[in-house]
Structure formats: structure tokens, C-alpha cells
Amino acid sequence: MSSFRKQAALLGLTAAVFAASTAQADEKVTNPDASTTSTPVANQSEKSVAPTGNEKGTASEKTDAPTKQDENATPVTSTNTKPSTETTSSKEGSLADDKALQPTEGQEVDVRILTTTDLHTNLVNYDYYQDKPAENVGLAKTAVLIEEAKKENSNTLLVDNGDTIQGTPLGTYKAIVNPVKEGEQHPMYAALQKLGFEAGTLGNHEFNYGLDYLKRVIDTAGMPIVNANVVDPKTGAYVYDPYKIISKTFVDKNGRKTTVKIGVTGIVPPQILSWDKANLEGKIQVNDSVEAIQKIIPEMRKAGADITLVLSHSGIGDDKYEKGEENEGYQIASLPGVDAVVTGHSHAEFPSGNGT
């Protein structure tokens, strides 16, 4: 494995370690902006393949009953990528500038991935169930940490790992009492967009209010929402964008600008078909997370991704692969071609502080 890939793997691990959630119910998150290219909708193959390879990055574990709060927030670490050189004067104008920003062999860029997960509509630091302020939840508090992290390293990608739109009275109000209308932006995504989130994925609780509601929310999210394991049960076509390639202009260790293309994809636990059976039965199929990522990684590489990032709304799990497991973060991190993984869903910290 190249030095870049190894460091990218560590990046994912650190991202997972620092990713925290603001939650009173259950899982993880997402984000906007940046130039992106979409991927074609394709059929999902059903190969039962156990992952192999060495470990790359992950975070957080799970229990799926609506539980209490969670933390919130996020920085990560550095990685060196195949970057580029600063532009010089040229008769070709912008074309020459574009070429000058392309990565060159041996160029190193420190990149920080910032993540949130399992926000569960906790916009402010207030526990609505106990009707009092709470210091361990709230996107408003996390926003300060995000700004501080960006000041420390401007080469950042800010993403959300799902379980974003459910969990407090705000989530219920915007889904049941005064539902998000066609063309209206959900308050959670309005806040994430304001903070500069660039991509996100779906958690299991995104499906609590049905597919029609979820579509309205995603359509106005203001950022790419990706998922690679939810497909049409008849055609096998992806229901959501399976990935996005996000082009970021970073500055290398020598002060030269370079463009790095980050391929972002995501998964949700297949168990949503049981947890939300009334909303989902016969309408979608949810493929094994490991197989879905195994299939999509080569497509992202072919589309030009320098780095691959998996937003795994899943706990870490273990080193024993069983098809259809709920928590497959470890297995996904072990797949060839996966550079970084963000996990969540379990409302747990990794490392835990007790050696696990």
C-alpha cells in the first residue's frame, strides 16, 4: 500500500475517533458545497464476498433503541495525497491553471476530515424531554468546534454520517405536525448547509417517516446525500446517489495549491427493513453493506477519486464477517481500496478508554 493510502487509512480512523454525536435517540450524519460529479445509476450485484486486506479506519458502535444523549462533533487528521503545483502564466489560460492544480507524485497534503453523526435534530444544547439545558448535545456548540478545527487546518472536508432528522420534538414537528413541503429545506439541513457541510449519508432513522417524506428532505438538503446499498427491489437500480466525487483545492506542505478528488459513499444497516417494515416493505431492498462498498469503490476510482471515504452509518463490529450484519465498520475498513471510514449509529466512543 502506498504511503498516501496508509495515511488516508489513519485519517479515517482518526476521523472516526473524533466523530461525536449530538443525540437523544440513535445514529449518524452529512454536508454540502464543493464541486461534485455524480455517478450513473446501476444495478446492484449480489456476490457474497468476505472482505480481506488490512485495516484502515472506523469509529463508533451501536444499540438501536432510542436512547439518551450523545456527544457531537469532530476533527481528524492528516494524509498525504497525490497533489499538484501552483499555476504559472500560460497562453492556455484556465486550462493551464487546471493542469497546474493536478496532483503530482510525491506531493504531500495534510487533510482533515470533520464529521458529525447521530445529531438527531439536536440543534441547540437543550434536553426537550427533561425541559432543561444540556451541555452534551447541540449542533450550536459543535459549530464552535468546527470553526476552530478549520482554523487549525484549512484543508478540510466536513461531512455528516446520518440520523439527522429524527430524535427531538423538532424532528416530529417537521415530519408530522407541520411536515416539510415540496421545495422547503429541513431546519437541520439548513443549519448544516450554513456551517459548510459538503456531503452526508442516511442513517436508519431517516426512514422513520416514510420514503416520500425522505425524498422531499433530500431534494432540498443543499448537499449530496449518498447511499450505496439501498436499491429498487425490481430493477436493482440505486434509489439514491451511490457516491459523489468532491473536488477540493488544498494547499500542500510547500504552500502549493492542488486539487484533490474525494470520492464519498455511504451505507445504512439492512435491518431498516425490519425496523421500519410498515414504511419500507416491498418498496426498497437493502443490500449487505460490505458487498455494496466492495462494488462501488472501483466505480469511484474509475471516476477519478484520489481518496475514497465511506460514511458508514454502522457500528464498528468485529473481524468476523457475516453477510447482512448491522455493524460492519471494521469489515468495510478492511476492504481493498477503502482509504477512510466514518462510523456511528451506536452512540459509543472509539477508542472507549478501556482498551476497546
For the regions a language model picked out, list residue spans one by one.
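Long, intrinsically disordered, low-complexity tracts enriched in Ser/Thr with interspersed Pro
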Residues: 27, 43-86
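Bacterial Sec-dependent N-terminal signal peptides
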Residues: 1-12, 22, 26
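Acidic, metal/ion-coordinating pockets
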Residues: 93-356
